């Protein structure tokens, strides 16, 4: 049977409302399904923020998810309201822009984010990519790890485009024209690597060098 994200979210929302009633502060969807880029391997990134989230709430939520179809695909985010309002702002920038609201609003979170938080998101993203790229070249030499780093770079490129242009776009194809030429090269590789199952050692070296140089530039520039 064909999977319908709309039908799944309707069932999910109904079950969450039965479980938590008026304790729901926000419910939404993010990730590849939210961006319209999902494939058969994509996770379901549901977002739920409660008035407060105890361990009992977390366990009850997990048990509720066990009753839903496609349980193995469910990922996402669960927290209490006070925690998300006190969250690292550089994380919240993309969290807010990447999440489709179904119940509630993230406007209160967005109000606390400024340009310095976006620059910090870029710097942290570039630093993490740089560190793991070096680690992979020295120790792992793993193609899947490198592909994951390019995926992370794609999120950093979203922040870069927003910082430079004021426009936020979820889809990579729409993001491309917002970027400078050197950043476009990295994003094109992000898209290409999604279609490649394996990499030769020569490709691993080539793509690692490209990513390392890109991350280095942004660490120093921003």
Regions inferred by a protein language model and the residue ranges of each:
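N-terminal loops that bind phosphate or other acidic moieties
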Residues: 43-45
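Short, glycine- and small/hydrophobic-rich beta-strand elements in well-ordered beta-sheets
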Residues: 22-30
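Short glycine-rich or small-residue beta-strand-to-loop segments that form or flank ligand, phosphate
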Residues: 47-49
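Catalytic core of pol beta-like nucleotidyltransferases
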Residues: 1-18, 22, 34-40, 51-222
């Amino acid at each position: 049977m064909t999977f319908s994200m709309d039908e799944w979210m309707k069932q999910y929302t109904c079950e969450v409302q039965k479980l938590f009633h008026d304790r729901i502060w926000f419910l939404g969807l993010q990730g590849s399904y939210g961006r319209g880029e999902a494939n058969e391997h994509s996770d379901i990134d549901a977002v739920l923020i409660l008035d407060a989230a105890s361990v009992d709430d977390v366990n009850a939520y997990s048990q509720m998810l066990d009753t839903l179809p496609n349980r193995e695909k469910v990922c996402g985010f669960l927290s209490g309201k006070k925690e998300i309002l006190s969250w690292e702002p550089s994380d919240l920038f993309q969290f807010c822009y990447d999440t489709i609201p179904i119940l509630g609003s993230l406007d209160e979170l967005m109000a606390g984010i400024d340009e310095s938080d976006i620059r910090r998101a870029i710097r942290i993203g570039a630093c993490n990519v740089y560190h793991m790229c070096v680690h992979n070249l020295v120790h792992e030499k793993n193609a899947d790890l490198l592909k994951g780093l390019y995926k992370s770079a794609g999120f950093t490129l979203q922040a870069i485009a927003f910082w430079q242009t004021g426009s936020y776009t979820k889809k990579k194809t729409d993001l491309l024209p917002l970027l400078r030429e050197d950043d476009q090269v990295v994003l094109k590789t992000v898209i290409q690597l999604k279609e490649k199952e394996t990499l030769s050692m020569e490709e691993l070296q080539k793509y690692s060098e490209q990513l390392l140089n890109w991350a280095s530039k942004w660490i120093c520039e921003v």
